[in-house]
Amino acid sequence: MSMRICPIEHKTVYKKFATELRSSRVAIKKDDTKTEYFGCYINDNLVGVVGYQKISDKHIRLKTDFVRLQYRRRKVYSNLWEFRINRILLLKPEVLSAYCTEMSLPKYLKSGFEVQSVGKNGITYVKLKL
């Protein structure tokens, strides 16, 4: 199994994942010029994606955490997470935040993020002060 993580464009994320993202309650807009994405390829198949958006010089929002069902439990999300965090830390933010589904919330809590609020839809807003 050959795994590769690299930056990808929004149009690729939208084309490959929009339907799956929405069915998993992960928000994605058709046009988004503000989010940076990283994709995970296994044997040249795009199987997972994570993103982030710079809210301000000191605040970065983590977004669009998704791995296709058949590739879960293969360290895809862990590798994407680490790749994204390493890139984000180069920007020297003071705060990271995210809106989490039930699927992504455990990883955020394990990484030190604290729950700020829970929406009526079950989406949890978390923050981490660096």
At which residue positions do the language-model features occur?
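Short amphipathic alpha-helix that is part of the acyltransferase structural core
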Residues: M1-D32
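Short alpha-helical
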Residues: T12-V13, D57, E102-P106
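A conserved beta-strand-loop-helix scaffold within acyl/acetyltransferase catalytic domains
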Residues: S24-Y37, Y41-I42, L46-R68
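Active-site beta-strand termini and strand-to-loop segments that position acidic
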Residues: Y41-N43, K127-L130
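Acidic/histidine-enriched, beta-strand-rich ligand/metal-binding domains
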Residues: K63-T64, R72, P106-K110
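Conserved acetyl-CoA-binding loop-helix of GNAT-fold acetyltransferases
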Residues: R73-N86
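Conserved GNAT acetyl-CoA-binding A-motif
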Residues: I88-C100
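Conserved active-site alpha-helix within GNAT-family acetyltransferase domains
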Residues: T101-N121
